[in-house]
Amino acid sequence: MDQFGDILEGEVDHSFFDSDFEEGKKCETNSVFDKQNDDPKERIDKDTKNVNSNTGMQTTENYLTEKGNERNVKFPPEHPVENDVTQTVSSFSLPASSRSKKLCDVTTGLKIHVSIPNRIPKIVKEGEGDYYTDGEESSDDGKKYHAKSKPAKPSTNVKKSIRKKYCKVSSSSSSSLSSSSSGSGTDCLDGGSDSHLSDSSPSSKKHVSGITLLSPKQKYKSGIKLTETQPSSTTPKCGHYPEESEDTVTDVSPLSTPDISPLQSFELGIANDQKVKVKKQENVSQEIYEDVEDLKNNSKYLKAAKKGKEKHEPDVSSKLSSVLDCSLDHRHKQKVLHDTMDLNHLLKAFLQLDKKGPQKHHFDQPSVAPGKNYSFTREEVRQIDRENQRLLKELSRQAEKPGSKSTIPRSADHPPKLYHSALSRQKEQQRIERENLALLKRLEAVKPTVGMKRSEQLMDYHRNMGYLNSSPLSRRARSTLGQYSPLRGASRTSSATSGLSCRSERSAVDPSSGHPRRRSKPPNVRTAWL
């Protein structure tokens, strides 16, 4: 164990192959000397023993291949590898004689009872690690051997080499067996059971080269599953192979199975049913009654399928999933059927409404009470009803006309009577209108006043300006008045009065013409701008 502890993952130490080859040579030399010394009878006995041991090893290999195949199907390949690598390498480092002894001890110590299944599952043999070596090439050329992954068929060379080694070991002398197995006796018992439990390869060639991919829990489970018995498939012990004849060996050839298992045939039937169902769901609205018939047929088919499943005894999970699928499909079909029926009813109702078109107003006639009428006789009551019906029809006909007006035009001779408040407002309005007309007439009759023309106003302005420039005394007096007056408005009034007085004096006698002019205004008249 310790001498191979430092081997890295992915590398192979080939030292044990050389030791294998040397041990094989020793065994061959011993067997040659023994064959020369033995009698012909002893040689015949040894040959029969070799044949029996070969057949025993073949049967164990066949059982191991079948059990390994089942375990490869059950267990996924993803498991930690490190602990198993060291164990398998350490167990494979023993010489060939010790390995043969180990196999014999394991098979004698443990009865192998393999339960033959009713049906063989489909096995995909991809990526099986098949390692084979050649001892002669390693001793002559010193080349390194590489692990090669091949399918299960080319591994017959490895089986033949293993059988030759086992034959050589069994034909060797007892001294070589005792000397080779004494050093590894305890390791055979301990490591043999571990290698037997951890072996999940499809054949015994994994003892030579393979690295198992099982955790310790799975090793324990696989060891337990080997002990499950079936009375028709018990095998003889390895130690008793030389004593029994070839006729007592149990035939372990694989049973003939049909091309399609019951589970696969049922799955094919379900797939076909699903295809038919998808096609029919495309036009459900047109095939409602066909869907009803399909539901009946499907229910019959599902019942028959359930009976077939009970006969074939499939797994519980497949039963549950199929029952759930069937119930879901049935519910889905019922839902689709109800939806299509509702849609069809709605479409029919809409079509009937469209056919009827716009309906006219229809007034329900009140039902005549059968009670006795004391105020009118029966003939009078009937006449009143007829008149009422006639009037009702007339009113309905006028209501249907768009431009009809039932309003009676009022006569223009009689105006509407007004209230006293409206009359007072009307009188006030008339008075205001009369006053406005009088003011308008007075404004239109007014003529323009004398001296209000623009030319006359300009002439007056120029005269006033010339007078102010020619008489500085008046300007000085005006300034003194402005200084002593407390208010500015008083100076304005004084200057205005003085100007008016001067103007009046000048206008009294015109020097150019000499004729006296008309006096415009007396001096006590107020000016317009004051």
Curated annotation (Swiss-Prot):
Compositionally biased intervals (Basic and acidic residues): 35-49, 67-82
Residue numbers of Phosphothreonine PTMs: T133
UniProt-listed GO biological process terms: spermatogenesis
Coiled coil (residue ranges): 372-447
Top-level taxon of the source organism: Eukaryota
Disulfide bonds: none
Record field: compositional bias (Low complexity): 170-203
Keyword presence, Transmembrane: no
Biased composition regions of type Polar residues, renumbered to the chain: 50-63, 227-236, 491-501
Keywords, alphabetical: Coiled coil, Phosphoprotein
Location of the region described as Disordered in the Swiss-Prot/TrEMBL record: 29-83, 116-258, 395-417, 483-530
UniProt entry tagged with the keyword Coiled coil: yes
Protein name per the record: Cilia- and flagella-associated protein 97
